[in-house]
């Protein structure tokens, strides 16, 4: 997706992509970080947070209508002291909310050429991991900058995760060098499927790298969106994943 500052427009686009994925037979659909709003300022985020029920309803109805598990990227939800959480919501095939994950690691960095980010000024970090039991497996939830903290993924795997989701809005300067490398590393070291839907293109206050990816537990890029917007697809064979973990039991060889 290439989300903008109007929630209603972003939800309309998301609905189109969800429907397209469902028609292709998808049983799990994941949206990118900030799918409902790429804000110009904090007042826009707070305004979106105040209409959170609209976004909840959208996700619930889309999941129920298409009978799929819908991983809602991330949305702004009300927090304290004028801040919001950057929250991934997951809805099941019956439209019920299965899990909530608040992004733990906030992007406070200074990049080259004056590009800087300070998410902690307007986002309240989460402090709990989240795993979803669905489609006969366990899905570990993360968001964007969490990707740089491998201990998060190792703990999710320790708790039984076989699929890892990383909805993101990576900066172009970091995405060009780090995005695919980090995702493949998380897949390889944890012997997990990695699903990474990404924002792309120009937004009100920034540009994003895009390149949504689905990566196998062996680190192979199975599906990629090298440019533009729209869904990508892959079949995650869980029996093959479990057989791989049995033949190549690196997760059982840990010493720490």
Regions inferred by a protein language model and the residue ranges of each:
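Cys-nucleophile CN-hydrolase/nitrilase-fold catalytic domain and related Cys-dependent amidase chemistry
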Residues: 7-102, 171-192
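CN hydrolase (nitrilase-like) catalytic-core segments centered on the catalytic cysteine
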Residues: 51-71, 138, 144-232
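Generic N-terminal amphipathic, Lys/Arg-enriched alpha-helix
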Residues: 1-4
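Short beta-strand scaffold segments in enzyme catalytic cores
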Residues: 72-73, 87-90, 130-132, 212-214, ...
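Active-site catalytic loop in hydrolytic enzyme cores
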Residues: 79-159, 172-174, 179-181, 247-250
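Short helix-loop capping/hinge motifs at secondary-structure junctions, enriched
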Residues: 96-99, 220-222, 242-243
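A short C-terminal boundary segment appended to hydrolase-like catalytic domains
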Residues: 239-256
């Amino acid at each position: 997706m290439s989300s903008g500052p109007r929630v209603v427009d972003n939800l309309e686009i998301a609905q189109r992509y969800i429907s397209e994925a469902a028609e292709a037979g998808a049983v799990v659909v994941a949206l990118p970080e900030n799918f409902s709003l790429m804000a110009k300022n904090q007042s826009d985020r707070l305004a979106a947070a105040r209409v959170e029920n609209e976004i909840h309803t959208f996700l619930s109805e889309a999941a129920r209508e298409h009978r799929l598990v819908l991983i809602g990227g991330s949305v702004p939800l009300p927090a304290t002291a004028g801040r919001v959480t950057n929250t991934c919501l997951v809805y099941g095939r019956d439209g019920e909310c299965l899990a909530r994950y608040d992004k733990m690691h906030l992007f406070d960095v200074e990049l080259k050429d004056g590009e800087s980010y300070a998410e902690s000024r307007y986002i309240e970090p989460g402090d709990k991991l989240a795993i979803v039991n669905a489609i006969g497996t366990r899905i570990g939830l993360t968001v964007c900058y969490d990707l740089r903290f491998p201990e998060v993924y190792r703990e999710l795997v320790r708790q039984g995760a076989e699929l890892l989701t990383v909805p993101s809005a990576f900066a172009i300067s970091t995405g060009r060098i780090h995005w695919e490398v980090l995702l493949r590393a998380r897949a390889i070291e944890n012997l997990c499927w990695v699903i990474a839907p990404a924002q792309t293109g120009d937004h009100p206050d920034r540009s994003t790298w895009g390149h949504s990816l689905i990566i196998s537990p062996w680190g192979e890029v199975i599906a990629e969106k090298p440019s533009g917007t729209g869904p990508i697809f892959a079949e995650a064979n869980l029996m093959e994943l479990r057989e791989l973990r049995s033949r190549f039991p690196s997760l059982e060889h840990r010493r720490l």
